[in-house]
Amino acid sequence: MNSFIKAVGVGCLSLGLWCSTALAQDSWWKTAAQPYQGATIRGISESTPASKYVEQVLGPKFTQETGIKVEFEATSWDQMYDKAIKDMEANTGIYDFVYIEQDIVYTYLARNFLVDITKSLADNAKIASPDFKPENFTTFLNYFKDPKSGDVMGVPMEAFIKPYLYRKDLFDDPAIQKAYKDKTGADLKPATTHEEYTRIAKFFAEYGADKELWGTTVQASSSHPAAFYEFFESVAPTFGVYNWGIDGKTFAATEAHGGQMNSAAAKKALNYWVDLLKYAPPESTSSTWDEVAGTFAAGRAAQGLVYGENAAWIATDESKSTVVGKVGVALPPVEAGVMEAAKAGKGYIGYYDGGAFGIPHSSKNKDASLLFLQYIGQTSVQTDWALAGSRIVMNSTYDDPKIVEQDKKVSGYYTLMRDDGKLFAGAPPFPFHAQVLQVVAPFIYKAIVGEIKPDDALDQAATAAEAELVKLGYRK
């Protein structure tokens, strides 16, 4: 024991700066948290890989360092929203921090649900951590700033793109390559156009007819908003239809009034997407983002658009995935001109998803929660969190040796996100997000099950969206 203590002492002498910094850091958290010893803060989030890491790792570590207990509820996407919004509306203070998905933040800001983090820390310097620096975050942080003041309203905890995943083992198999060439006259490679993607999907659906293998995933639940999101945020942009087809100035949705929701491009996109169901596994019409990830991990699809938060575990975790070492990553296929528009900053090719933790005004433990949000916003906790959840919210994380090593195992997913993340975009800054979703989604569901044609679905959806926007006062 004495030898061990002496060794540690020598280490601290030789690395004095490091030791004093680490001890000072520990001391700061303990000192800052002293007034809140024994307090319990409660948070809620969707049960994602990144959230589970908070629940299982970061929450307990924070408690150990500060004495503040963290109760974290990781639940379903719909329950997360339902519980958090009802709590904030009723001002009951059940939750001290809530998950704010990128696409709902504008609604929360419009309804004044959230505490201004920048102002709160400026007003109480005793709980402002020197290790919490907003400038360390990627530009994804901008989605969680008040557009008027520029103040931070949420601390990013996950951010990822939705790339095109494909089975490298199938695409690289010489026998399959020959069969594809004989069948189609083309070389088998990741699709860059929608025509190529459909051709590959059809080929693998036929090839895998007796192998429990289909040609593509489709996030087409006929009763869940996941279908709305896949179409409007992942598929429609690849056809040049942005911001759900709603004009950001006039709030027109119909083509007749200057919108794009029922434009020729939008109709081509929906027909393409619905047509892919012919080559997708039977669970596709009941698949949300979770089931799509499960389908791909089970080896039931040759390709698909899969949320990046699942990329790491699908490619590396043998306890949950049957395709470890077999996953390729690429950009989604697009229509002519769309990639060029995205590179010029005039469009985008898919969804840049993610979220932050924010503090409701209804919270009864705001200061303790501010400490926790800063704790998860330290550079030092980012790398292992990224390994667990395929999420990166700070530029420095990309260069960490652990991430560089894992990047090789996930076919360059992190490199793709770093270099081409600018080609993706979050949801449009609409405070009426939920209302339009509710009136438009039913028409997408009807197209999925074949109750109405895709063209008719979008005509009716655009009309319904405009009517709702008139009702809400956005459009006259």
Question: At which residue positions do the language-model features occur?
Answer:
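Long, aromatic- and glycine/proline-rich binding clefts that accommodate carbohydrate-like moieties
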Residues: W29, V327-K343, L387-K446, K476
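Extracytoplasmic "Venus flytrap"/periplasmic binding protein-like
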Residues: V57-N136, P174-A175, Q303, S319-T322, ...
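Hinge/lid segment of periplasmic solute-binding proteins
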Residues: Q25-P35, Q102-P163, G328-P333, E340-K343, ...
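Glycine-centered hinge/linker elements that transmit conformational signals in sensory
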Residues: E196-A205, P237-S286, G328
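Short, well-ordered beta-strand elements
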Residues: Q37-T48, I68-E73, D96-F97, M153
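Short, polar/charged alpha-helical segment
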Residues: S27-A32, P49-K69, L165, D169, ...
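Extracytoplasmic "Venus flytrap"
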Residues: W28-W29, P35-V57, D78, F160, ...
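Extracytoplasmic/periplasmic substrate-recognition and gating elements
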Residues: G150, L170, L277-P281, S319-R391, ...
